Regions:
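Hot-dog-fold acyl-thioester-processing enzymes
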Residues: 1-9, 56-58, 65-145
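Small beta-barrel nucleic-acid-binding modules, principally OB-folds
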Residues: 4-19, 142-154
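HotDog/MaoC-like acyl-thioester-processing domains
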Residues: 15-101, 151-160, 166-175
Length: 175
């Protein structure tokens, strides 16, 4: 941010090995495994006290000029300062989500207004809040082991979020 640059997430994939218990001691590790002047890719691991992986994630983010909120290239000198680590060994699905061509209609769910508690430092709904909204939209008791999120147009304070759901043989989709 000191250079007037930020990063907006474009997509995230989370593979869940097991859900931690409430109050369980956890360690979060994150690192960059790919980066160029336009975007960067990052792994994140959630580890239990024994060092076992509870969840593995990868995300891709695009660099933005914070004064215009538009995508930008970072200066080469900044790119040269980025330390890359090897990518975590996991299944990397394409970052672009293709919604299923479903014969049944999507179920419209209750609308939600983006309130102040959901807003991040860039004045948009925080990425984690989209996860919360999606989880809330799942059918009661729905068990999942993988989450994929595509971040499109960022919602701002006061925006009306209108989720819809489709359950197929491949899984449950929230849009």
């Amino acid at each position: 941010a000191e250079h007037g640059l930020g990063m907006y997430l474009a997509s995230r994939q989370i593979d869940i090995v097991r859900m931690p218990a409430y109050g369980e001691q956890m360690t979060l590790k994150t690192w960059i495994f790919d980066c160029n002047r336009f975007y960067g890719c990052r792994n994140t691991l959630l580890l239990d006290a024994a060092g076992e992986v509870c969840a593995a994630s990868w995300c891709i983010g695009v660099f933005v000029d914070l004064s215009t909120a538009r995508g930008t290239r970072i200066p080469q000198i900044l790119l040269e300062q980025v330390r890359l680590e090897p990518a975590y060994e996991m299944e990397y699905l394409p970052h672009k989500l293709i919604l299923p061509d479903a014969s049944q209609p999507w179920e419209q769910l209750s609308d939600r207004v983006a309130d102040r508690s959901m807003i991040d430092r860039y004045h948009h709904v925080n990425n984690a809040r989209y996860f919360d909204l999606g989880e809330e939209a799942l059918p009661e008791g729905y068990a999942y082991r993988r989450v994929r999120i595509a971040y499109k147009t960022p919602a701002k304070h006061g925006a009306l979020i209108c989720p819809r759901r489709l359950t197929t043989a491949e899984g449950c989709w929230i849009a």
